[in-house]
């Protein structure tokens, strides 16, 4: 065992703090670089391996960039509101504020022990009034611009958490938090109009340095599609409804239409004899989430209303059904069905014995879903694809029964939560004035501490008379406060702005400061946030830009996702499986740098993998080996026998490995390919060890090589490297020095090893100068003592020279 361990960690953490090494100065030289890891939720008392895998390697990247001359801003904070703390309070009786702040205290200590260069002076905690005051301000600004509104809507309701869930928080019909089956419930809720920015959210994606998969997920979630909205009239009625379709060329093949169970027309369209069946079906549909209802693997079901609609293009009468695979919140809440040319419609029609009419030629069997010439389409027969669409839309336009339409899958962002532990929505309701925004000077609307937060389906804040009753800011009369709280994603939708100016008590942020520091240059976090946090933050940035507060379009210029660290059994870590890894235990045994380097060397950063105790032991042995080599190097430099001043073969070999390492550690670290970067450092380590075995060493050259070695190692093992840097005789931090410069000339070798073959079989190897001609290489090969002996008495027919690689001799 070497000397490295937590004692060294603590020594350097103290020195860094005392010297203010990691304090950020916006006026310091160097190009600004805003590096941000997604802040953690303090739902547990300790950081887990996943936190470390996000924060440790990203800090190494930030240190690397600092040594490359960047002025790095790397803040840290806590996403402190949310359900887990409230659920923990319900279970234990410990108040969410108390448990959250205690957890934050523990996690701050752990984050400091990591040795990351976080700018703690810029810390934010979203559950504190000095932060959520400004979350409320953001909400009010959206409200002023008409981007926040209230409406009655069917929502996802978790009966266990007793709160509304956004669509993104429902996984396969279950609550992502507690796995309960999600139900549908009609409630008056607050929404943010993210749909106003649908086009820009889509169009600006391609210009971002983000993983393609994440961009594809956002594109799918926004779901822009160009099609046609056609109007169907209900038979013997004044009622009409619209359907949206991207395949208007198949309109003649419509044999039935389907309405969402929640569609307000269903009750008026359902005949008396069908009412019982339709009502029963509606009740069942309420138990399903939107995502579950649209699952491609789930069998589609429906029930007939008893009414008929008229196809606008051919006048045919088609039955009106109710089906839960149609959503009231998507498109018009009504769809036309063309079973001959749509797989879902075909399965539904076959199940319920509904007509199937081919209107497109092609394919050996139905359903045929490609484009083709129209048949059974009257005046449109023979038309193909876009030509057919144009002709049909023209007729619909003439009859005022349809037109071109762009549709989106994206829905407005539901932000109301019927829970306690969140930012109160800054709105009051007055009998005289209606809905009134709380004036900015009255912010924050603070959460009361003494509250009954046991869930019963009502907002806990509604049970606090002190909180509930207030004065109307407009008329001075009695008013009641909004008792829902904001979705925690509202808090995290703008936090990257507050970091820059976190102590500002007059504004959410200083406009000049934010526009100087933003956007975030490198953002690192999990891919699970693709359609929630990452989308919401983009929306809020654009909204604040349009209000004049920001001068940039996107919050995060470059995005990197870390992979997942699994348990030793290869499964996702969980307490119930007993496969969790406690970083503190390993840090205590091996030190923070061994833990950090294991995470970076043991896994491809974007992929992750299964934890291995054997692998972290191997990394500990490697650090011990480095410590021995560096100690031996210092001894050799002090030894008077080492008098060499020339650069000869041994020095050239080490210099080659040195610059090869500089080149590839630089390139790989830049791309977050830490495992291969550390592999190059390991090769450099072996070359150093080999050089130390030389009889006479060039001490000046060795010191240069060691200086570059420690610099290369520093971002990956910051405490250990600072210690070795000091032992080398330096008085300033290694992180105030410049990154080693790669010299391409060092990779041009004076000699190269070649193989010598006879009749295609290798018989010898030899080193030759790299500047020899083919004739000189041939002569050198034939004069090799081993080859001369093997060729004795033989006739040389031909000698083939492959420069820099081999010589093949053909002889008989």
From Swiss-Prot:
The keyword tRNA-binding does not apply. A motif ('KMSKS' region) lies at residues 572-576. One of its GO terms (biological process) is leucyl-tRNA aminoacylation. It is found in: Cytoplasm. Gene3D superfamilies: 3.10.20.590, HUPs (3.40.50.620), Isoleucyl-tRNA Synthetase, Domain 1 (1.10.730.10). It catalyses: tRNA(Leu) + L-leucine + ATP = L-leucyl-tRNA(Leu) + AMP + diphosphate. This is Leucine--tRNA ligase. It comes from Clostridium novyi (strain NT).
């Amino acid at each position: 065992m070497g000397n490295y361990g937590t004692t060294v960690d603590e020594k350097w953490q103290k020195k860094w703090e005392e010297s203010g090494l990691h304090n950020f100065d916006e006026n310091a030289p160097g190009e600004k670089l805003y590096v941000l890891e997604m802040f953690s939720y303090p739902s547990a008392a300790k950081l887990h391996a996943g936190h470390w895998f996000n924060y440790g390697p990203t800090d190494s990247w930030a240190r690397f960039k600092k040594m490359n001359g960047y002025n790095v801003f790397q803040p840290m904070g806590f996403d402190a509101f949310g359900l887990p703390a409230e659920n923990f309070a319900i279970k234990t009786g410990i108040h969410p504020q108390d448990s959250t702040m205690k957890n934050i205290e523990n996690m701050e200590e752990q984050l400091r022990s990591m040795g990351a260069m976080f700018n703690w002076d810029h810390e934010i905690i979203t559950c504190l009034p000095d932060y959520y005051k400004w979350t409320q301000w953001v909400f009010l600004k959206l409200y002023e611009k008409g981007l926040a509104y209230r409406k009655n809507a069917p929502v996802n309701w978790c009966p266990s958490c007793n709160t509304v869930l956004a669509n993104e928080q429902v996984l396969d019909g279950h609550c992502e938090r507690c796995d309960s089956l999600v139900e549908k419930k009609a409630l008056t809720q607050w929404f943010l109009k993210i749909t106003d920015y649908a086009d820009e959210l889509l169009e600006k994606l391609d210009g971002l340095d983000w993983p393609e998969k994440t961009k594809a997920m956002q594109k799918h979630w926004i779901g822009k599609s160009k099609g046609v909205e056609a109007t169907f009239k209900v038979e013997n009625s004044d009622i009409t409804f619209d359907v949206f379709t991207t395949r208007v060329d198949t309109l003649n093949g419509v044999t039935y239409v389907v309405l969402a169970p929640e569609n307000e027309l269903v009750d008026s369209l359902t005949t008396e004899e069908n009412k019982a069946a339709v009502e029963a079906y509606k009740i069942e549909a309420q138990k399903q989430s939107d995502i579950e209802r649209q699952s491609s693997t789930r069998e589609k079901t429906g029930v007939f209303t008893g009414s008929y609609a008229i196809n606008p293009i051919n006048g045919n009468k088609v039955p009106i059904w109710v089906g839960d695979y149609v959503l009231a919140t998507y498109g018009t809440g009504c769809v036309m069905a063309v079973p001959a040319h749509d797989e879902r419609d075909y399965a539904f029609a076959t199940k319920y014995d509904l007509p199937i009419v081919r209107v497109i030629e092609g394919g050996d069997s139905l359903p045929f879903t490609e484009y083709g010439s129209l048949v059974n389409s009257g005046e449109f027969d023979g038309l193909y694809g876009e030509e057919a669409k144009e002709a049909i839309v023209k007729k619909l336009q003439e009859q005022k029964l349809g037109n071109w339409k762009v549709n989106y899958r994206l829905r407005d962002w539901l932000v109301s939560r019927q829970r306690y532990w969140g930012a109160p929505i800054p709105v009051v309701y007055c009998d005289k004035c209606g809905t009134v925004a709380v004036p900015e000077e009255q912010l924050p609307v603070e959460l009361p501490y003494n509250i009954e937060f046991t869930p019963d389906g009502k907002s806990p804040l509604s049970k606090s008379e002190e909180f509930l009753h207030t004065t109307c800011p407009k008329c001075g009369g009695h008013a009641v406060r909004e008792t829902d709280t904001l979705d925690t994603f509202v808090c995290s939708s703008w936090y990257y702005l507050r970091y820059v100016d976190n102590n500002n008590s007059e504004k959410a942020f200083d406009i000049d400061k934010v526009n100087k520091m933003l956007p975030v240059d490198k953002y690192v976090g999990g891919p699970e946030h693709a359609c929630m946090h990452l989308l919401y933050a983009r929306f809020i940035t654009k909204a604040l830009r349009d209000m004049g507060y920001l001068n940039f379009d996107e919050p995060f210029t470059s995005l990197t996702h870390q992979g997942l660290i699994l348990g030793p059994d290869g499964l996702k870590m969980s307490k119930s499986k007993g496969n969790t890894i406690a970083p503190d235990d390993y840090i205590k045994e091996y030190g923070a740098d061994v833990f950090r380097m294991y995470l970076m060397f043991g896994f491809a950063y974007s992929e992750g993998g299964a934890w291995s105790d054997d692998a972290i032991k191997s990394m500990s042995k490697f650090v011990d080996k480095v410590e021995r080599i560096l100690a031996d190097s210092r001894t050799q430099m002090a030894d008077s026998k080492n008098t060499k001043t020339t650069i000869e073969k041994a020095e050239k070999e080490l210099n080659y490995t040195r610059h090869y390492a500089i080149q590839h550690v630089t390139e790989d670290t830049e791309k977050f390919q830490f495992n291969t970067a550390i592999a190059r450092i390991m090769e450099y380590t072996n070359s150093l060890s080999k050089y130390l075995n030389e009889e006479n060493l060039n001490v000046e050259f060795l010191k240069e090589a060691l200086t570059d070695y420690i610099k290369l190692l520093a971002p990956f093992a910051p405490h250990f490297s600072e210690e070795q840097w000091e032992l080398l005789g330096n008085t300033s931090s290694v992180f105030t020095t410049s990154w080693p410069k790669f010299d391409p000339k060092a990779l041009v070798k004076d000699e190269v090893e070649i193989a010598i073959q006879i009749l295609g079989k290798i018989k010898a190897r030899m080193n030759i100068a790299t500047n020899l001609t083919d004739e000189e290489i041939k002569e050198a090969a034939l004069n090799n003592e081993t080859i001369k002996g093997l060729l004795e008495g033989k006739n040389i027919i031909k000698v083939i020279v492959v420069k820099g690689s081999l010589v093949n001799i053909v002889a008989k």
